[in-house]
Amino acid sequence: DLWWLKQVAPMAEYFPTHILKVSMAWSVSKCKYSFQKMMSMLEPLSKVDIIDQMRVAYEYFPMENKDVDFQFPVLILVGKKDSTGKVKTYCKEWAKRTGYPLHYIKGAKHFSNGDNPEQVNKEIEDFINRIIRKERK
């Protein structure tokens, strides 16, 4: 897996800038709103900026965060239709290994808060309320 992650940034260099941005936006978006929002976030970035961010996300992040132990409550949300790499697989394994709750966002890809904001907000609200109730006991 790590070898493939290191290939993402070099492969992106072969894409024309506009095609790179459009393909990235659609790959994480299920609905038009999310696509447009993602395009607006990518718009000010140059191809070099995007590739630098890919390098951080795909090459460095997995190594730097492999043994992280959070000392606060964690909720894992993942789009039911997320097809970004192995995100769903990794989230499932992370939840299994740590006991963190994992919730799937219906009809959503990787940009799940844009694809289904109602469910994302409800999941977060319910999570916070469970923590508050637990602390009051």
Residue ranges of model-derived segments:
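Low-complexity, flexible helical/coil segments
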Residues: 15-29, 89-93, 110-115, 137
